[in-house]
């Protein structure tokens, strides 16, 4: 069979189905000594060491016990339950606790089917996979749905003046969202019954679309250290901007509450908590309160009915000149709502708020006449118009940045005003779970920004 396989073409191999026959597997242990040691794991034994994403600092190894992971199988079902008919398409790395638990262990425990992609889930690979697999469940990070919304959905409502006018009126906007929602379901294979979103803050504009479109999504909140889920909401219970209430068996409260805002650090008590950080006793000690609650590092507030609202990461928060708490994630959400912005990072440079932006080239070309030609000519260093086009492009991009600066500052409060927009020139450096490595850009800001596109 090996010789025959070697003769097959790549096209034929890709169409082959792999069948594993379990009949006769008992023969493997037939001659094993009865005295062989049985290694039965105990609940408090370490089952996995999974590293944090490393968005704000160096990744830490999180030690999760068998008890912590298995207890997730008791706290998740009241929120959402898999069944044997479910088909899950895995698009996140299994080294991420979110995918490991919700995308593998939990569906396996319910007898669901799981398909794995053999390449990164970029659009050219993901779209065909969705049509082939036709999944009923996907566990995703916000970035993927935000990209779908910005590239596939929002442009359809900006085609002409009539559509823009209709979209600006709430009743017709909801109707347009309903129509677009049906197309989105078809895009995802037509069988989707649960699209889980977690791992980062979800853009409110994209979430508003999903809710009004009737798309079957859910929001989850958790961390690597909590294996991961702490709170969540699905279906009609979803509230835009909230991660939902604490899951069954999980307790959440606020620590170090600011009396003026009612916000504080969210701390958690859960049976799914880590045993500690691998070979890092100091970090482990700092991760818990004196009475044993886990410090999430997230700032937010909890409504009277228990619904959790996250404002941002404690490490990301910027203190303004008069002591104001500034959440860069809120400013970035406004930046990202502009059609020409693909993604952004807000930080401080010499004590002033600045926005580092990755522009959407296609959106820029569609919005500003002549940019497409300038982009092409400015890349051709051997062309006769290289220097002239590059100069014209820089002037045009300065105009774009000024417009974006005005756009943002008209939508944020006075102490969240940004002073400068910097073009990063390319995508931001990210973790395997598509989170921007913020600390990389915060570190660069201390010495004055050098965009990624200019780095050697």
Predicted regions and their residues:
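Conserved AMP-binding/adenylation subdomain of ANL enzymes
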Residues: 70-87, 94-183, 191
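Conserved pre-ATP/AMP-binding loop-to-beta segment of ANL
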Residues: 17-51, 58, 81-87
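Structural core segment of the AMP-binding/adenylate-forming
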Residues: 1-27, 36, 351
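Conserved AMP-binding A3 loop
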Residues: 47-73
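Adenylate-forming
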Residues: 273, 307-336, 363-378, 383, ...
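Conserved ATP-binding/catalytic segment of the ANL
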Residues: 246, 253, 260-320, 337
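Gly/Ser/Thr-rich phosphate-binding loop
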Residues: 17, 136-139, 148-238, 342
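Conserved C-terminal "lid"/linker of ANL adenylate-forming enzymes
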Residues: 343, 351, 403-456
């Amino acid at each position: 069979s090996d010789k025959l396989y070697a003769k097959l073409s790549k096209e034929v191999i890709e169409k082959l189905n792999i069948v594993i026959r379990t009949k006769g597997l008992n023969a493997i242990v037939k001659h094993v000594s009865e005295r062989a040691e049985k290694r039965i794991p105990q609940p408090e034994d370490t089952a996995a060491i999974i590293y944090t994403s490393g968005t704000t600092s160096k990744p830490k190894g999180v030690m999760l016990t068998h008890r912590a992971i298995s207890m997730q199988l008791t706290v998740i079902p009241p929120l959402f339950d898999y069944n044997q008919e479910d088909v899950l398409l895995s698009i996140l790395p299994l080294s991420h606790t979110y995918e490991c638990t919700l995308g593998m262990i939990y569906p396996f425990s319910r007898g669901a089917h799981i398909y794995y992609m053999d390449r990164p889930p970029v659009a050219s690979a993901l779209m065909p996979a969705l049509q082939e697999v036709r999944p009923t469940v996907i566990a995703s990070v916000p970035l993927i749905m935000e990209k779908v919304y910005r590239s596939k959905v929002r442009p359809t409502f900006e085609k002409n003046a009539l559509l823009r006018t209709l979209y600006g009126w709430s009743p017709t906007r909801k109707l347009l969202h309903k129509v677009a929602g049906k197309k989105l379901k078809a895009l995802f294979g037509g069988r989707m019954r649960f699209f889980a979103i977690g791992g980062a803050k979800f853009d409110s504009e994209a979430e508003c679309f999903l809710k009004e479109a009737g798309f079957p999504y859910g929001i989850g909140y958790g961390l690597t250290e909590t294996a991961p889920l702490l709170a969540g909401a699905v279906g009609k219970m979803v509230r835009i901007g909230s991660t939902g209430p604490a899951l069954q068996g999980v307790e959440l409260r606020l620590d170090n509450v600011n009396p003026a805002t009612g916000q504080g650090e969210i701390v958690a008590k859960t049976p799914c908590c880590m045993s500690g950080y691998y070979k890092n006793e100091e970090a482990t000690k700092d991760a818990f309160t004196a009475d044993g609650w886990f410090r999430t590092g997230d700032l937010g507030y909890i409504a009277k009915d228990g619904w959790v609202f996250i404002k941002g990461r404690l490490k990301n928060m910027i203190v303004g000149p008069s002591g104001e708490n500034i959440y860069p994630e809120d400013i970035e959400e406004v930046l990202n709502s502009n059609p020409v912005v693909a993604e952004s990072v807000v930080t401080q440079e010499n004590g002033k708020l600045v926005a580092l932006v990755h522009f959407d080239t296609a959106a820029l070309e569609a919005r500003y006449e002549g940019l497409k030609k300038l982009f092409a000519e400015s890349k051709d260093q051997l062309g006769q118009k290289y220097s002239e086009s590059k100069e014209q492009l820089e002037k045009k991009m300065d105009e774009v940045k000024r417009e974006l600066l005005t756009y943002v500052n008209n939508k944020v409060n006075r102490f969240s005003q940004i002073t400068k927009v910097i073009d990063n020139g390319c995508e931001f450096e990210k973790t395997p779970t598509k989170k921007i490595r913020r600390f990389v850009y915060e570190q660069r800001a201390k010495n004055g920004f050098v965009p990624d596109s200019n780095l050697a």
